[in-house]
């Protein structure tokens, strides 16, 4: 005591949905808590949310900077979402970036509220299997497992909490669980 803990969250909200009270209690008891968001969760963000944030960004930039780069990018994204987007096609990288950024900031706020004091205890893994821009995801790969292994060897946790809803309709929770289990299996002979 205190213990070093990693909470693995498949999406940037599963940590507080699945174990928010425990998360808060671990921090309250002064354990060294890390949270690892395995995917960006970007496709769960609606287009209207992106438009709202882009309008905010555009207006702030117009007020406080003469550089037009960010303002123009925000306007480009707004125009695309309102007039050009074709349902069923993969999202544009800029839109995915905005959606992922919205989820990251929501996750950071939730982690801080739960008691994490330092941003270096909040990890965004962005596992590659998820980043297709579509509901359908890629299969788990060695690249995904390597990212989880690196976090485990960097943090060297005493305890881990892993969300693994095997009934997840899109399979993301299952794939994320399998990434952690595969990484643990590959590291089982390591000592820390």
Regions inferred by a protein language model and the residue ranges of each:
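Active-site beta-strand->loop->alpha-helix modules in alpha/beta enzyme cores, enriched
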Residues: 1-12, 16-191
